[in-house]
Amino acid sequence: MNSKDYNVYIDEAGDEGLNKGSKYFILTAIIVPKNKDLEISKEVDCIKNNLEIDIKKQLHWNSIKGFPNKLMIMEKIGSLDIKIVNVIIDTKSIKLIPSNNIYLFFSGYLFERITWIMKENNGKANILISSRGNLSKNNLINYINHHNHSKFEIDSSLIKDIKIIPNERKKLLQLSDCCCSSLFQSLKYNNNTHFEYINKIKSNI
């Protein structure tokens, strides 16, 4: 049986600096059937139109004003044929991992779960990661492959490619930002109002 291709978009929220960053650091992947990538990308344009944002401009969660607008975004995301995977790190509980290694270390858990989903769905993943200052594709691949035997259950044969791309260049990276940052705000404020964001997408998680 031929495998099915998926595009996986990864972003992060929070600051992983120990003792000086945010309490939570979150990695989020949205998993999209490749044959529906364009269709779902057009839904980002619909969101921008509803918010009166130029479709050529970046959709960025922290720039969106007003609870109703943010809730509209999450309702739209909840209606899409996507799977959302989150890894939530409580940075205040980390004792042995240097802050500059937190992203690499916990991305292993994210990749592990991505490949589990690929295996369950006879799929292969094209992974696109939102660029960040110190993130190197080679370092990421080498880290995951080197530690695969001891820490993670990552089937690298189910990963076709990894690319690191600026967020503004991919609409679905912007959607991943919304999923990740909304979860971050829900945990930060810890109230029913902000948890409504997550209620809208709970069937996708």
Predicted regions: what they are:
Residues M1-I205:
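Phosphate-ester processing/binding pockets and catalytic centers
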